[in-house]
């Protein structure tokens, strides 16, 4: 509701009833309703946040997902266009942030998974923007925490300045693909042994 000079806004599932209309995780399989609404209403974009408003995803004008991995990438691109500096994301994030950071003359740093680890690394290197590949944007100019509303403001500002449609903006970034699957671990699986074997097997390779 605080989007300012927006020509037309339509809300979906914004009333706090105590029950989620669908799985609240902002993943493509859970966002079919808003994707269809964006196309039906000929909207410029759709904005999606999770219940505690620390994850942010966008839907492009054609109903496709902007992909939450690229939320941070686009926001960082905007921030770095105005202020040179370094960026941080965790190891479960797209390499596209590294590409954008280096293109803007900065240095990318990776952290262990977890918001607390990202924040610690950001403070260590003095990063100007950081976050996680799940759509979490951390902008230290305001505070050291994932904040979807900050991400919305930065993203919309950048989109307005570029004059691009969502799909066109997305096309300006490298296309990387990731499969994030949860693996059930049992006591019979020696995780440390598996990691050691992977390290040994690829010892001669350059890991990035």
Model-derived regions, located:
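Phosphate-binding and adjacent anionic-ligand microenvironments
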Residues: 45, 83-208
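Short glycine/threonine-rich catalytic loop with a Thr-x-Gly-x-Asp
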Residues: 49-51, 65-70, 143-146
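Short, charged, surface-exposed secondary-structure boundary motifs
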Residues: 17-24, 77-79, 118-122
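N-terminal small/polar loop signature for handling phosphorylated ligands or for N-terminal nucleophile
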Residues: 9-59
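Short Gly/Thr/Asp-enriched flexible loops that form oxyanion-binding sites at enzyme active sites
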Residues: 54-72, 97-98
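Short, small-residue-biased leader/transition segments that mark boundaries at the very start
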Residues: 2-7
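Short, acidic/small-residue loops that bind anionic groups at enzyme active sites
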Residues: 65-82, 86, 112-114
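Short hydrophobic/aromatic-enriched beta-strand-loop microsegments
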Residues: 8-13, 65-70, 105-113
